[in-house]
Amino acid sequence: MNSELSQDLGASAARQEHLRDVVEHAGHLLPAQGPIGVFVHHNTLHAFQHLPFHDALAAASAIFEAEPYLSEADYRAHIASGRIGDEDLEAALAGRFAAQPDERRGPLSRREIERLALRHPIEAETAAGLLWRISEAGETRRLRADVPDERRRRMVQSTERWLEARPEIAARLLDRAGRDPEARAALALWDACRAVPLPPAPPLEPPLVERVGEGRSHRDLLVELAGEDPAELIDPLMIRFLGAYLDEGIAHWTMPDRAKGLWRCFRDMALEGSRLAAPAFVGLDAELRRFDAEALSPPAIAVRALEELSVAEDHWDVYVTRVLLELPGWAGMIHRLEHTPSDRPPGSPPVSLVEYLAARLTLARYALRDVARRRLGYRGPLAGLVEHARRAARPPAPPSSSPDHARPFRLFQLAQLAGLSAAEIEPLSKAERVWALEALEAFDEITRRRVLHEAYEHHHRTEVLHGIAANLRRPEEERSVEAPRFQVAFCIDDRCEGLRRHFEELSPRHETFGVAGFFGVPIRYRGLDDAGHVSLCPVGVEPAHEIVERPHEEEAGWRRKARRKRWARFLHALGRGTRTLARGVLLTPTLGLLSTVPLVGRTLFPRAAARLRRALERRLLPPVPTRLHSPRDEGSAAGGEGQPFTAAAKAARVAATLENMGLTRGFAPIVVVLGHGATSVNNPHQSAYDCGACGGRHGGPNARLFAAMANDSEVRVLLAARGIDIPDGTFFLGGMNNTTTDEIVLYDQHLVPSSHRGELSALIGALDAARQQHAHERCRRFASAPREGDAARALAHVEARAADLSEARPELGHVTNAVCVVGRRSLTRGLFLDRRAFLVSYDPIQDQGGAILERVLLAVGPVGAGINLEYYFSCVDNRRYGAGTKLPHNLASLLGVMEGSLSDLRTGLPKQMIEIHEPVRLLVVVEASTDTAAALYARQPALRELIGNGWIQLACVDPATRRIACFTGDGFAPFSPPDQPLPAVQRSADWYAGRSGFVPPALIRAASTRPREVVDHAV
């Protein structure tokens, strides 16, 4: 007896352990987005990254029921607009037939069939739809409108000649079509297509009832059979519970006893203060007490539920995944918080995906029984539900005695598009007809969209590489800066491409660089007014140093801090007061009335209201001069966290960043290091607009710290020993670029030597002119922006967008990102790239062994791919992979957004962030020989996964020969640019003027560094 009990306990423990493994595996398929306050872009299909790109899309589409590409209609619209050309389609088909030879039977080859299917819809039709198209629309009496005129004439002429030898057929057609030769040609072709009976197309998949437990759940079965979704009984309860349990600060009253864990809180909710009173859940309280009496753990409860549902253990993985994907946003957040506790504030309750699964399956059993009883009249055990549904399912209809015209009708459409008349179709055997249809059917919708997508990307890739090739044909002296007056290091962010271009157009002596926006300085930072520290570094990096912003005068700082605390306590008390019964009755009407004045101002005059608010803040909280301080600086006493920031550590950080971007000599008198971030109001996705290299936060503190370290005399001595000799006359300045308003702030200007003050004024003037021109360029993409007007008016518009409460698009973020160029600026200086390119500075001449390139690609590759792929997937299916429109979004638990007051957490990007995006994979152009790139590819698994599996596309520009080669999977193939010149204009504004859509590359003469008559911008 004891032996049998031990065996049962052992088997139960093994099943529970298996369930934990299943849940952990399923968790990888859930959205990995963390709390929305620190939004970091990532590959939406991270769990499939080990697969080739197109295979991953197919697998994910099957699991998530999501779209892998744009629709065929979208791609055909791009064909019509010229965004996909004939050469692009042929290149995509050539890639498809590279591994399999073409085949021809009868008048058509497989490649010709596929070419026609790409350009024209040849859809299968239902019986009812086909009947309508034939009898009502009369589509067999005329040729398709999209048949080219030349083929139309040839078909009519061929049919007339064919009918001359067949007077009986001609007579019948005369009765049916009259004397219209096109109608006769169409009817004759239709008769020829249906003259030979064809077998029906095979079914695509077995009935759903046969797939329950094997990719589909009992919920799916009841939705199909009963027309009611059991999840509608469960989801409102789970959403309210999870919102309260996971809340990080929205709720006025916190859920009690959260420290006991998710399952115990769920159990308490059901048993105590919030009984589940719905009729569907009668008996739940008694069952929960039985669980307590048996001391069942959440894994044991989940296992028991699966057994009651009769789900075989070897099918648990697909079934559990299906259940968790019923609320993927909430389930994904639980999984994320369980494995990344650093995302949460101190004191947060424990979370467990297994406990969530146990709670959901417990409710699911009751909901399934309720729907089955009410809708199907089934009152038996859930284990018998599938068999009951199988018996109750409608038997298949007997074969119809009437002929099946579905496949002949597709043959009829195919023949028209190919220009084949009845004369060519009539002689075809049944086998030849079936072969043509099978070739068409095998080239199904998803395959067609894949090929169209590859053609779409081919067009984009050709445009970009053609632009770079044309730019490289210009003399080197036109593309490089010999004696720079100003040097500005921007983040690699694609939004900086336009600002860099406009700054360079102002003078041939303006030089820019691109480097990851934390500037190689990962820190834990606390600003003067911040409540705590934040990590300003890429996700996955643990900062070793702590930096604090302190006032120069401690007394002034304490006065400001005290005044700020008093004001914050007052506002907090008012906010809490409006939520209480007694004070709320008094405060709400009064405050509501008073708030109408600023509300009207912020709505109708957002820019003016924002300026007034900032002026009041400066009056109430006067700014104080500050400095950056490390509590663990060398020689300091204990205090703070992290390691001491020694001179050697500073020099190592500065040297690595300067070497990465190739700035080791030729320093300008003023070098600006410019971080970036964004500002907006009423925008839960604010963090998604900030610097990804800083973990979804502003990069200004990193830039300021880097400049301070580079100005340190002791650091410069150590840098000189490493071969980086920064002249005494060079001064570094940190700064911050607001990508929403285009504002640029330079820090610590009071430290600039008096000898540089004039140049500093000129630099500020140049940056101001560049940001105005950049705002002008950005405005062409905003539907509400002024179409006419100067740069100053455009700047005022973008400033107003950042302060507008009603603005759903304060800026467009990384929308349009498509390219990453890793190399010297001479590759792209003077090339218009439409703000679509991540620009990463790298000098191959200073990196003969490829070590720097390896470092750069390992950092930039995953980051760029993550941004690009999140935009890709949110664009191709904003319902499944994206967050939908912002308009109904509400902040939920300070974790994410949901639609209205009761929905799943919406992950991914909202519609307003991707509306104008072109979903293409990131094209990474590296200035390196193919040998160097191949060596890095072979050595680094992370690069091999991204490049080899096609998640990003790679092209190399040889530093010696300037030839371009593209990675194909089997090696590198030379790129041959189109035999046509690239357009050239004087300035960027001349090229984008009057255009609101995408603009292809062009050469910009104003950015040329060749000596010419030019006046340096100054104020």
Swiss-Prot record:
Residues bound to Zn(2+): 491, 493, 676, 691
Chief location of this protein within or outside the cell: membrane
Compartments where found: Cell inner membrane
GO CC annotation terms, alphabetical: plasma membrane
Residue ranges crossing the lipid bilayer per the database entry: none
Taxonomy, superkingdom: Bacteria
MF terms in GO: zinc ion binding
The protein, known as: Probable inorganic carbon transporter subunit DabA 1
Organism: Sorangium cellulosum (strain So ce56)
Lineage of the species this protein comes from: Bacteria, Pseudomonadati, Myxococcota, Polyangia, Polyangiales
Gene designation per UniProt: dabA1
